[in-house]
Amino acid sequence: MLHTVNKSPFEHKALETCLKFARQGSAVLLIEDGVYAAARDTAVSPQVQEALKSVSIYALKPDVEARGMQDRVMDGVRLVDYEGFVDLVAQHKAVQSWV
């Protein structure tokens, strides 16, 4: 399953809830303000690092760049462009949006 998170983890619980329900082998795509979860050395970094052990985490590159975060993305989080976003949707049978 592909999970999408578009809310900042510093203002909403969407990421926390998503990671509780994401099963091993799932993919999580951070979009819009959700990309703040991809930043290294933050309060949520340990939670994201732990999740990377069982799920793939992606961040939408245009959203990362729009927030000036391209040099702060933690290791293990993969950046994708819009084409990569479409590919992720096509690869998964279901998409769950956490809002």
Spans of features found by a protein language model:
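Short, glycine-rich nucleotide/cofactor-binding loops
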Residues: 1-14, 34-40
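N-terminal phosphate-binding or glycine-rich loops at protein starts, especially the Walker A/P-loop
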Residues: 10-33
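Short, conserved loop/helix-junction motifs that constitute active-site signature segments
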Residues: 20-24, 47-53
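Charged helix-capping and loop-helix junction motifs
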Residues: 41-47, 79
